[in-house]
Amino acid sequence: VTSVLTIIWTFGMLGWVGVPLNILSAMIPSLIIVIGSTEDTHMMAAFLRGLAEGPKENSRREAIKYMAKHIGLPMLLTVLTTTLGFASNLLSNIGLIQHFSFAATFAMLANGFITILVMPLMLSMFGKHEIPSPSGKETKHLPDRIMSVFRYSQERFPISILVVTAVLCAFFIFQASKLYVTNDPMSYFPRDRLLIQDAKRIHEDLAGIKIFFISLKSKQSKAFQEPKNIQKLMNIQQFLDNQRVYDRSISLADHLKFINQEFRGDSVRGSLPGTRELVAQYLMFLHRGDLDSYVSHDYRRANIVVRHNISDSHTLNQYIEELQEVIDQIVGPDMESFIVGENLMVNNVAESLMVAQVKALALLMILIFLIMSIMFTSFKGGIIALVPAIIPIALMFGIMSYLDIPLNPGTAMVAVIAIGIAIDGTIHLLARYNELCRRTSDYVEAVNSAVNDEAPPLIVSSIALAFGFGVLIFSNFTIVAQFGALAAATMLFSIFANLLITPIIMTRIRLIGLYQILSMSIDLEVLNNSPLLQNMSNYQRRKAILISELHE
């Protein structure tokens, strides 16, 4: 119900503000369903926990109150972090990603708002009144089996697990350093598609449909009536031929070579006229309109038109860099050289994709660190929250590099979106642990209880997310399929990070929530008369009491 309402709101908003749909926006309904269901799962788990711990009378109402009290703040934070994960992609310079980011950001906010309003209402009307008594035979479900393996490893090899995880992350981060950006529209489709086959057939019969220009500019008037300068055009074209990646190049030199051959015979085939006067005479045989694409009216500028069929921006940019170095050597200091073209401008924007995603990732991690540090009144809380977020991302980028999957408009978004989603489980786990620490001084027992309470919804929601993203693998668009596969893998990695690594760290650190400090009820007269709490602010007194342990 919450997902259907969110989908209606989202597409209504897109139509109202005039944001167009694209191949990435088509994923939004699936994202709303799988991501929205995770909060429903955590709320249902808290509701059932409230039924188990609350009184029998008015059990449904008391369970809803319990749910609101214990999961309200964590849920607000998870909605915020998930929204930030999508919103950070607004920093991209690519309209395709910006439109998707806007739609997904609104969808996450709308889903959070609808879930907070609708879910308690539906539970009050259709929720259980009590939890059935357990049967004599206890059955282990999938979350229980996973946690039994994790708990065995945590109790016996905690240090080894941390060391192995650190080594794995270092290895995959090293692999991630080999990632590259590409903007290849043809790679958006499987190779067996008719469109790809037709494009290959056209390339076999015609020169490349893509064009860029090599422009040379001299300070001297009529510089490109000098044979030595025209020879520079010819030398550049010879290097283009040697690169063996372009279909054809045309310049003023080709026109002059053709006329020279027609006048002087095959003995001078491929040769330029030897004097400036001869060049001027040959130019008189050409209409001005025939030369507009190759030389300016004052002959200070000359162009080489290069036709090619390289659609992969990463490959083309490598050849362009090599070409620019050679051109600078050929033309010397007396001329300026430029390599320009519409597809090169698009490629430069694509290269900025890497920078934009690094900025978005850094911004999101800083925001999560600050939010969690404020929530737990300590930088340690922010650091702990980042650990299970960094591990899946490091593994994902490493796998991308190992499998030679480039950064493109689809895969570039996985990191920030996955962090925003994966951190949800961490927030619920830390919030539950923080609550249980008030009841016991045994941190290990508090961690185990928190994991037991939060593992089922966390595992179920992560697996549901993995399946939800995994459905996108069957998309006809390659970048959407890659996005789905990587996001699904990241969700599974987050189970490992949240339930194996985070509990090991939690047993060694005590956290106090800001909400607990602000909501704590204390007798000010008693505190003012306490020698131990003298010269402390009210905030410091509250935190000292909450972090203290009582031993008999």
Name the predicted role of every residue range.
Residues 29, 210-212, 245, 300-302:
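Envelope-exposed proteins and targeting segments
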Residues 528-552:
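Regulatory nucleotide-sensing modules
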Residues 1-184, 311, 328-520, 524-525:
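Membrane-embedded transmembrane helical bundles of large multi-pass transporters/channels
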Residues 205, 235-245, 322-334, 446, ...:
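Generic non-transmembrane alpha-helical segments
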Residues 150-152, 178-224, 239, 272-295, ...:
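Solvent-exposed, non-transmembrane loop/terminal regulatory segments of multi-pass membrane proteins
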Residues 243-285:
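Alpha-helical transmembrane helix bundles of large polytopic membrane transport and channel proteins
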Residues 1, 231-234, 278-365:
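Extracytoplasmic
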Residues 202, 214, 240, 249, ...:
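Hydrophobic, well-ordered secondary-structure elements that form the walls
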